[in-house]
């Protein structure tokens, strides 16, 4: 992290992972713990939403954010988007809770029993030790991240083609996608209007391409260190890597917000409510186009706006850490502004 030439800087508890940015073993433990918390929330909140779900009220009007995703994946859904069985949701919630326990145990192991720094260990674990100024090792770790993202994209393809299918909002039934679109011109054509996709064949075909590209990129980064031009262009430091990550999350959040707001194939009206419209107040926001009872908001409104505002703050984090990475000292800016004020 940026220390401004102070090698003895001490981070308090609120600094998060910065406290052990140079301890690769504890750094892994922190990430595993964060994964455990994420899966714990997903499992527990799925069960909570099951307890609140009312079959007689449209799902999109109940303020649910997880069950609509599971229904879109074809779990427990019958004709016309009717939820006929909530037991699959219970099982999925349980699997997430069990996974969180396993991940939590892994986090505790890495925190209390594992080596604090993988540099001091032996065997295959040592190859995951990294230094923030080592482009080759950072590329290796990036490659493994891309492999997992690619496999996740292909899991959706597997669900669509082999494991029960997806809910098709155009026909209002769960169906298997037998012939996904593989024409690269069709898939690439969505670059300028990705949110207009209106058939499962194109949606699944896009995931095939994305999954394969991610896996290909992962293999590339594992076996090949960054090219000379990348080493010259990019800054390799903890602060810079954090800024790149936050920027990527911000971009994904903005894309997800818009996609959720307007697309009714990946986000069916039956589960999320009607499409939204963009409005402007103190800030831009997405508003329901259908008035709900008791002044409530649709699941689509909750998700789109949450993604938008979270993405906005991730973008601020990206800019903050990017500026710090290139050497901007915000303390000096404050001193300069105070000096100007005093002079006046």
From Swiss-Prot:
Lineage: Bacteria, Bacillati, Cyanobacteriota, Cyanophyceae, Nostocales
InterPro entries in the record: PS_antenna-like, PS_II_antenna-like_sf
Gene: isiA
Subunit structure: Under iron-starvation forms a complex with PSI trimers, where the trimer is surrounded by a ring composed of 18 IsiA subunits.
Entry similarity comment: Belongs to the PsbB/PsbC family. IsiA/Pcb subfamily.
GO annotation, cellular component aspect: photosystem I; plasma membrane-derived thylakoid membrane
Subcellular location: Cellular thylakoid membrane
Membrane topology: Multi-pass membrane protein
Keywords, comma-separated and alphabetical: Chlorophyll, Chromophore, Membrane, Photosynthesis, Photosystem I, Stress response, Thylakoid, Transmembrane, Transmembrane helix
CC cofactor: chlorophyll a; all-trans-beta-carotene
Cysteine disulfide partners in this protein: none
The keyword Cytoplasm belongs to this UniProt entry's keyword annotation: no
Cofactor note: Chlorophyll a.
Name recorded for this polypeptide: Iron stress-induced chlorophyll-binding protein
Gene Ontology biological process terms in this record: photosynthetic electron transport chain
Induction: By iron stress.
Summary of the function given for this chain in its UniProt record: Functions as an antenna for photosystem I (PSI) under iron-limiting conditions, when phycobilisomes disappear. In the (PSI)3(Isi3)18 complex most of the harvested energy is probably used by PSI; in other PSI-containing supercomplexes a large part of the energy will probably not be used for light harvesting, but rather is dissipated to protect the organism from light damage.
Entry-linked Pfam families: PSII (PF00421)
Residues that span the membrane, as ranges: 25-45, 89-109, 138-158, 203-223, 240-260, 303-323
A GO molecular function held by the record: chlorophyll binding
């Amino acid at each position: 992290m940026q220390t401004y030439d102070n090698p003895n800087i001490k981070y308090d508890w609120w600094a998060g992972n910065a406290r052990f940015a140079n301890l690769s073993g504890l750094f892994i433990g922190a990430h595993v713990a964060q994964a455990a918390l994420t899966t714990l929330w997903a499992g527990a909140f799925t069960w909570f939403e099951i307890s609140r779900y009312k079959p007689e009220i449209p799902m999109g009007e109940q303020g649910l954010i997880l069950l609509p995703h599971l229904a879109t994946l074809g779990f427990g859904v019958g004709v016309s988007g009717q939820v006929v069985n909530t037991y699959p949701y219970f099982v999925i919630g349980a699997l997430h809770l069990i996974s969180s326990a396993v991940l939590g145990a892994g986090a505790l192991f890495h925190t209390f029993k594992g080596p604090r720094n993988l540099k001091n260990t032996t065997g295959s674990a040592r190859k995951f030790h990294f230094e923030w100024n080592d482009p080759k090792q950072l590329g290796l770790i990036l490659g493994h991240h891309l492999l997992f993202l690619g496999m996740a994209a292909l899991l959706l393809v597997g669900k669509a083609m082999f494991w029960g299918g997806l809910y098709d909002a155009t026909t209002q039934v769960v169906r298997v996608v037998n012939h996904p679109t593989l024409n690269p011109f069709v898939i690439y054509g969505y670059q300028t209007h990705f949110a207009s996709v209106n058939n499962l064949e194109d949606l699944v075909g896009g995931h095939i391409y994305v999954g394969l590209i991610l896996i290909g990129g992962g293999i590339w980064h594992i076996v090949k260190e960054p090219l000379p031009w990348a080493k010259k262009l990019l800054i390799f430091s903890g602060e810079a890597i954090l800024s790149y990550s936050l920027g990527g999350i911000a971009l994904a959040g903005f894309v997800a917000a818009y996609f959720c707001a307007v697309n009714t194939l990946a986000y069916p009206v039956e589960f999320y409510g009607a499409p939204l419209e963009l409005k402007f107040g103190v800030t831009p926001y997405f508003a329901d186009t259908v008035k709900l009872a008791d002044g409530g908001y649709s699941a689509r409104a909750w998700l789109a706006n949450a993604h938008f505002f979270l993405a906005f703050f991730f973008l601020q984090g990206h800019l903050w850490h990017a500026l710090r990475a290139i050497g901007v000292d915000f303390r000096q800016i404050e001193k300069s502004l105070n000096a100007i004020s005093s002079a006046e």
